[in-house]
């Protein structure tokens, strides 16, 4: 079966790896004392500020995450933009 998975490129994270990632997330959240409510407020604040410059932001789809990088902990914001027929505005 692993031959078929290798052949078709299907790679799944082990449950141990998932558990490790979840634990790291909990530890990072605890280190910075960020509650789920604070993360939600940060997401809303980011959306509000970014919409001033990019009206095409899809605020409902913004994802804010904390993760551990090689040298630093990382705060990542994935901000999807709706595609529009208009070009960039000149403000």
From Swiss-Prot:
rRNA-binding listed as a keyword: no
A single GO BP: cell division
Keywords from the named record: Cell cycle, Cell division
Coiled coil: none
InterPro entries per the UniProt record, alphabetical: MinE (IPR005527), MinE_sf (IPR036707)
Domain of life: Bacteria
SUPFAM superfamilies: Cell division protein MinE topological specificity domain (SSF55229)
Entries under HAMAP family matching the protein: MinE
Family: Belongs to the MinE family.
Described purpose of this protein according to its UniProt entry: Prevents the cell division inhibition by proteins MinC and MinD at internal division sites while permitting inhibition at polar sites. This ensures cell division at the proper site by restricting the formation of a division septum at the midpoint of the long axis of the cell.
Protein name, UniProt field: Cell division topological specificity factor
Species in which this protein is naturally found: Chloroflexus aggregans (strain MD-66 / DSM 9485)
